[in-house]
Amino acid sequence: MTLITLVRFHLKGFTLIKNFMIKTLKYFGLSFLIVLLVVSLYLMNLFSSRPYSIDHYLAKELIVGVTDSPEYMTYLGIFDDLSFFFKHNQKLSVPSSEKSAEDYKDNLERLDIIRGFNDSSLNKNQRITKKIAVFDTENDIESYERFRYHSYPFNQISGNHLNLVEFMTDTHPIRNKNQASDYIRRVKMFDEVLDANLKWLNEQKKLNIYAPKFVFDHVIKQLRELIAYEDSKNPLMLIFKEKIDKLDLGEEVKDNLSKELSEVIRSDVKPGFQSILNFMLENYQSANEYHGVWSLPDGDDYYALRLRSYTTTDYTAEEVHQIGLQEVDRIGNRMREIFLELGYEVDKPVGEMMNDLNEDPRFLYEDTEDRKAIVIRDYNQMVKEAEEDVKPYFYKFPVSPVEVRAVPEYSEKTAAGGYYQSPSLDGTRPGVFYANLYDIKQTPKFGMRTLTFHEAVPGHHFQLALNIENEELTLYRRLGYSTSAHTEGWALYAEQLGVEVGMTKNLYDELGVLQSEMFRANRLVVDTGIHHKKWTRERAMDYMKKTTGMSDTEVRVEIERYIVWPGQATSYKIGMLKILELREKAKNQLGEKFDLRDFHAIVLDHGIVPLFVLEDLIDEWIEESKN
C-alpha cells in the first residue's frame, strides 16, 4: 500500500465515520457522544502513534500542517466533503507572533527527528526525502532566527491585501448555499486578519524596517481602489454573484446572500483595508530610500540565504551576477544572427531591435473592447496545439485540463505578464494560466507561444499537475516541498524545448523565446545588482531595457517585483542551466542509449526537488542506463 493510498484510506475511513455519525444522530440522538469517542480514538491512532518511518512522520506533519491552514485545505479541495467537521471553508488564517514562535519550536523538533532517521535504514527515495526535508527545515529555522521581519507583506505584486481578495474570488468554492454562506463568513474575517497584519507591521517598525517608497506608493493606490469600489462592483461581490447565479436557489435567497455580503464588505472589509492604508500614510516618510536588501540589518547574509533557498545551490551573489552577464552576451549573439536571417540590418543593440519589433503593427492586437476575449481565445488554441506537439517527447500527460484566463482587473496593473495556478488535488479545479492583458500592446503575437510553453504546456502545467497526480510519490513529496529552481527552471527549459522540437512556427517565435530567455538571464544580473551591488531601481531598469527591448511598463513591473521578492527571480535561469547541463551530460555519456522521454521522466517523476537532488537522480539514471 503506497503512502498516498494509506492517506486516502484514512480519509475514506473518516468519511465512513462521518456517514455513521449522521445516521446515529438521526436515530439515536444522545449516542453522538459515543460516535465522537470513536472519531477521537481514530484520530489519536493516526496522529499520535510513533513515526515508524520518515514517510509516515512527514505525512503526519504535513497533514497536521494542512489542517492548520484553512486556505490550503480549500486549495486542495479534498476536505470539502468534511467541511461540516473542519469548518475550514468558514475560516482564514490569523497570523500572530505566538503562532510563529510555535512553528519555530516545531521546526527545531522536526529537524531533530528527521536527522534521527539513519541513512542505512532508508531506501533510495527515503534518503532523497530526508535530504529535501533537512534542507528545507534548516532554511526555515534560519529565516525565523535571523530574518523574521525582513519581508514586505504588503507589496504591489503579492501583498496580503491582494492575496486575500484573489483567494476568495479564485479559490473558495461556491457550489451550494452552505458554501456561499461560508464565503461570507470568510470575508467577514478580513478585518481580523488585517488587524493581525497591522500588529506585525508595527513590530517590523520597531526594527526600523520599511519597504521602499515606491512600494508604499503602489500599495496606497491599490488600497484606495479596493476601498473606493461600489458594493456592486467590488471584486468580492462580482465573483460571488456570478457563482450564486449558477446555483439552483430562489431569487429571494440570492438577494439576501448578496445583501449580507454587501454589509460585510462595508463593516469588515473596508475598515480592515483602511487600517493598513492609515499605517502606510502615517509611515510614508519613513519608507526605505534604498531598494536592495543590503540596506536591511544583516542584509548581505539575508540575501545569501534567499539565493540558497531559491536556487538550491551554493552560488554566491557575485557568481550569479557573472553567470548572468555571460548568458546575456550569448543570447544576444543568437538574436543578432536571427535578425540577420530575417533580413534586418543589425545596426543597433538587440534590445532596441526587439523594442522596434514589439511595436510592429504586424504583431499587435487591435485595442478593441473584446481584445481580451480574442487574446484568450488565441492562447487556448496555442495550448491545444502544444498538447499535440509534445506527445512524442513524454511518456505521461496531465489528467487535469488547463484553462487560460485574464489576470483580474484589480491586480493587472502591477501583476507579472503571466502566472500559473495548479489544479486542486481532487480534480474539481483545473490548472489555470493567467495572462496579463492590461496593456494590449504588451502582448506581441511572437511572444505568446513562449508564454504558453512556460505557463502551460509543457511548462508549469505539465510539471505541477503531473506532480499532484503522481500517486507513486509520498504525500510529502507531492505537497510538502517546492522550489522555483526546479519548477521555474523546468518552465524556462520548456520554452527552449519548444524551439528544439519545432513547436515554434517561425523565426519570430524563436525570437520570442530568446527574448524570454534574455529576460531571465537579465534577472541574474539585476537581482544581484540591486541586492548585492547596491544598484538603484532606475539603474536596473535601464540595464534591462537596453538588453531586452521590453517596454517601460514591463521593465518597471519586473524590477519592482525583484525588489520585494529578493532572490526568487534568479532561480529560473539557474534551474534551466542545471537541467540543460544534466541533459548534455546524459547525452554525452549514454550516446545512442539516450532517450529524451527517459530524461524528462527522471526530471518530472520524482516530484519537485532541489537541484542538488536532481543532479543525484540524473547521475544514478545514467549509471543504471549504462548497465
Describe the function of each predicted region:
Residues 10-11:
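Short hydrophobic targeting helices and cationic amphipathic motifs
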Residues 14-25, 439:
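Short, Lys/Arg-rich N-terminal segment immediately upstream of the first membrane anchor
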Residues 25-627:
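N-terminal maturation segment of proteins
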